[in-house]
């Protein structure tokens, strides 16, 4: 990517709308727009000023009445000269406006190129740039809030403080090396141990937030499982508030997984209605059962339905008890369904598992019927929500890996200190940890990493 040229792209979504914005950034941005703008001379305009005029094409034909907003470098989003042309929405006017800018000397922007230029010009670090993509992709209120926290720099500040601590450690050790022939002590062993222990604890705490960040970003997967005709599809429809799955009295109606989403307490929950679990000679249904089993193993929460009038068989009890006993991450909830047909029958209780009964059929008309399930889901994410509100959380797998590697390096430094290894070897580990943290914020990076990160973005961002 060259920063010597000027780029342009439509920055707003396609489709019918009151307004659209065509953005241009680069050394010639103001001159290029001025060539096709009939109104105030934009080349004479002050920064952060808006100008009403008419945009024309290469032949001088009017395209649209527009507002051109000028931002002069370095006081712009990208750190370069930027002009944002606001035209009428729809498909045609923005396309014609963009084409005019391209005809007058701009180049079509690559995906994420505006944000990449902001990063390269020091307007944001790499973690903040990635937060822009996360903010755009956010599918729930809490994911949006967590991404905004990163964009505002709280996460980067935390990493910056950690790097400062490691630099302090490195400085102390290197001073000891430089003055090893003299009777000068810059930091005693206990002080170095304390600093390493503190750094290790902070890194460990940060890594512990990743499951929270992952759930906020990707959502919580709730699998609805059980025997055929237990009422799984009816429950799915009740949980999401509309008919998403076909409901039939015929066992085996659901042969493939059906997914639906709902936001509860600001968190995205992904509900998966699975094929009924049973032995079958039907190849298509058998494939559905296989997929259902896989989904249960990957679930965050399992709502296991059974018909109260039929009860749980020994195979189901063993399956659920195994999930409870083997320390699985899956949290099963045993649900006795069709309580409207058997109001006096108790729900099955299994050691270590939550059990309740309801009527999924009645729940479609009465939201209170599924409220205990919604409360349970809220409880499962309560700790995550509390953690996200208290401090920034790690939401990015790339960051997680760099933090793991930084933690490994700090732990190796601690072991080296305990073993009495020379200061030279100790600083190698500390410098390795510094590099890993620098890779998160972009202080240390390479072109391939940048290409991979910014390719996630849409054109115009």
From Swiss-Prot:
GO terms for biological process: tRNA methylation; tRNA wobble uridine modification. Keywords: Cytoplasm, GTP-binding, Hydrolase, Magnesium, Metal-binding, Nucleotide-binding, Potassium, tRNA processing. It is an enzyme of class 3 (hydrolase). (6S)-5-formyl-5,6,7,8-tetrahydrofolate binds at residues 23, 84, 123, 461. InterPro entries: G_TrmE, GTP-bd, GTP-bd_TrmE_N, GTPase_MnmE, MnmE_dom2, MnmE_helical, P-loop_NTPase, Small_GTP-bd. One of its GO terms (molecular function) is GTPase activity. Its main location: cytoplasm. It is found in: Cytoplasm. Its EC number is 3.6.-.-. Its cofactor is K(+). Belongs to the TRAFAC class TrmE-Era-EngA-EngB-Septin-like GTPase superfamily. TrmE GTPase family. HAMAP family: GTPase_MnmE. This is tRNA modification GTPase MnmE.
């Amino acid at each position: 990517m060259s920063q010597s040229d000027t780029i342009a792209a439509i920055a707003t979504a396609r489709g019918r709308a009151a307004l659209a914005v065509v953005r241009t950034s680069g050394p010639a941005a103001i001159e290029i727009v001025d060539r096709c703008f009939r109104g105030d001379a934009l080349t004479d305009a002050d920064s952060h000023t808006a100008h009403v005029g008419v945009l024309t094409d290469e032949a001088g034909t009017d395209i649209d009445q527009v507002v051109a907003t000028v931002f002069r470098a370095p006081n712009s989003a990208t750190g370069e000269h930027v002009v944002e042309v606001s035209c009428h929405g729809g498909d045609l006017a923005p396309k014609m406006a963009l084409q005019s800018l391209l005809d007058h000397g701009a180049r079509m922007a690559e995906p994420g190129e505006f944000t990449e230029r902001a990063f390269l010009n020091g307007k944001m670090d790499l973690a903040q740039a990635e937060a822009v993509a996360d903010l755009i992709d956010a599918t729930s209120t809490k994911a949006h809030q967590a991404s905004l926290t990163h964009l505002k720099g709280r996460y980067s500040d935390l990493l910056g403080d950690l790097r400062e601590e490691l630099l302090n450690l490195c400085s102390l050790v290197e001073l000891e090396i430089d003055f090893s022939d003299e009777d000068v002590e810059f930091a005693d062993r206990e002080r170095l141990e304390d600093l390493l222990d503190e750094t290790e604890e902070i890194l460990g705490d940060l890594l512990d937030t990743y499951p929270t960040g992952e759930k906020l970003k990707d959502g919580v997967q709730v699998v609805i499982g059980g025997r055929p005709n237990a009422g799984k599809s009816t429950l799915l429809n009740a949980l999401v508030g509309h008919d998403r799955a076909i409901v039939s009295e015929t066992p085996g109606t659901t042969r493939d997984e059906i997914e639906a989403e709902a936001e509860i307490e600001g968190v995205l929950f992904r509900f998966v209605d699975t094929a009924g679990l049973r032995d079958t000679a039907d190849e298509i249904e058998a494939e559905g059962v296989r997929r259902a089993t896989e989904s249960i193993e990957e679930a965050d929460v399992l709502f296991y339905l059974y018909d109260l009038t039929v009860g749980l068989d020994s195979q189901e009890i063993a399956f659920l008890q195994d999930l409870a006993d083997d320390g699985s991450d899956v949290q099963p909830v045993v649900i006795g369904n069709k309580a409207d047909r058997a109001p006096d029958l108790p729900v099955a209780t299994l050691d270590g598992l939550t059990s309740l009964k309801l009527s999924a059929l009645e729940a479609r008309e009465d939201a209170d019927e599924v409220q205990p399930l919604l409360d349970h889901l809220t409880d499962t994410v309560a700790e995550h929500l509390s953690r996200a509100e208290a401090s920034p959380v790690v939401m990015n797998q790339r960051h997680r890996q760099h933090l793991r590697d930084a933690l490994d390096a700090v732990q190796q430094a601690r072991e080296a200190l305990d073993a009495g290894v020379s200061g030279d070897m100790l600083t190698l580990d500390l410098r390795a940890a510094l590099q890993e943290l620098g890779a998160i914020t972009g202080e240390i990076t390479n072109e391939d990493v940048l290409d991979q990160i910014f390719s996630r973005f849409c054109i115009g961002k």
